Amino acid sequence: MIVLFLLIAAVFVGLHWYVWRRLVRDTTARGSAPRRIGTVALVVLPGLTLLAVRDDLPGIPFRLEGVVDWPGFLWLAVFLYVVLALVAGEAVRPLLLRALARRDVKRAEPVTAPPRTGAAPAPADDAPAPALLARRVFVSRVVGGSAAAVALGTVGYGTAGLLRGPQIKRLTVPLAKLPRSAHGFRIAVVSDIHLSPLLGRDFAQHVVDTINSTQPDLIAVVGDLVDGSVENLSTAVAPLAQLRARHGSYFVTGNHEYFHDARRWVGVVRDLGLHPLENARTELPGFDLAGVNDVRGESEGQGPDFARALGDRDPARASVLLAHQPIVIDEAVRHGVDLQLSGHTHGGQLWPGNLLFGLTNPTVAGLDRYGDTQLYVSRGAGAWGPPVRVGAPSDITVIELASGQA
């Protein structure tokens, strides 16, 4: 663990040095105000990021955490795209330098040069040092400015998209065992709301209003509701009491609940009128609905128990499983689940995060089939860390179950 920490720290510091070199040192004069300002910014901003990644900062009132979290997490997103853009710019940099050098040589050539009899041609000198230096500074400013503009534009777009709220997706999923009487049953799936100092009560209210507007038969809240303690976020989650569905609202824990006393949060959710499925199931018209605790709960003796949630049931009935992480799909297949509903991945949240999540999750987003079991993974409604989504817009999915007997 110490080795991993040191490796991450070295990469973090090294990449910030690279950004400082390309954006500050290579584009400003030594001792100038822009260089001093840029240097200070590239010390303060990563410091705020390190503070932001810690939940419930000791000694800082919860309402003030957002003052740290907003710039800290936004810088983390900007930093990601600045690095990517600068790395891409390394390929452009030598091309620009050569093009400018050729242009300067052509400008320096005399229009007419009458030959001198008996005079030896003057040796060709390299470009004067001042001219070469000027070209390098110009190219550094073009590449650095472009990288900064791309990063800021990308993060600005991704932040605005998240704050507008999740999109509504609609998907029809056929289940062979579903009776005709349950054909068209609609489940509103929402995951990864991540209420926090950044996304508070207003965001929760918007999510609730969006869900209710779909008029679902059932609501499934598939984990990672909060990023904070009950004391700090009880007001933020209050709008969930307004969720309305004909067959009720159900909840399973995500890994983030276990960072903040999952047992207490389950109690809060129950008081709000949702039905926690803690390794349990309930019979609904036409199918069984089961839920398991998140695998993170294993460290506290509260891990998933598939035998308890899915054992001793009628295998002729269709079954839907709520499980926060897609990685439990093998257990779902083993227990004959027809449809598993999950979240956790955020669809990658920040491109190219989808590629990284694909290394550790069977499905990053959308619907897949594993044997006789279908797995749907929501991209989630909120965001963890940077309040930004790029290439993975947030969603609330309305799944309409279709009977194979219809």
Give the role of each language-model region.
Residues Q167-A406:
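Soluble catalytic domains of enzymes that build or remodel membrane lipids, polysaccharides, and related
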Residues M1-L163:
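Non-catalytic terminal accessory segments
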